[in-house]
């Protein structure tokens, strides 16, 4: 991953972790995982739910959907100008053939 990719990814995952935001993680194979981000590094995300902590490889993740908006504080921006990101997911039904 490029340095620019990390500049977006790390603050987002860190905000989810610090604020204990429930998330849905969709894998590239369509499986949906739910829990809270416990930790992460360059290659994996630790996702905790009520019964288990799962190590999810980032290359298997398609989408991370927070249950609510999170406040992203970019380290290279002044504290007076926080950035908020709101993610909205819409399900689209494919017409039957």
UniProtKB/Swiss-Prot annotation:
It holds the Pfam family Hfq. It comes from the Bacteria. Residues 10-70 form the Sm domain. Belongs to the Hfq family. GO terms for biological process: regulation of DNA-templated transcription; regulation of RNA stability; regulation of translation, ncRNA-mediated. The gene is hfq. This is RNA-binding protein Hfq. Residues 74-97 are annotated as: Disordered. InterPro entries: Hfq, LSM_dom_sf, Sm. Signal peptide: none annotated. Residues 81-97 have a biased composition (Polar residues). RNA chaperone that binds small regulatory RNA (sRNAs) and mRNAs to facilitate mRNA translational regulation in response to envelope stress, environmental stress and changes in metabolite concentrations. Also binds with high specificity to tRNAs.
């Amino acid at each position: 991953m490029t340095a620019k990719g990390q500049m977006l990814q790390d603050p987002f995952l860190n905000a989810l972790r610090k604020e204990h935001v429930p998330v849905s993680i969709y894998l590239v194979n369509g499986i949906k995982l739910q829990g809270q981000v416990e930790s992460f590094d360059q290659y994996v995300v630790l996702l905790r739910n009520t019964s288990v902590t799962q190590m999810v490889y980032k290359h298997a993740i398609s989408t991370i959907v927070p249950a609510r908006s999170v406040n992203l504080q970019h380290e290279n921006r002044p504290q007076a100008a926080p950035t908020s990101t709101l993610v909205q997911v819409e399900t689209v039904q494919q017409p039957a053939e």
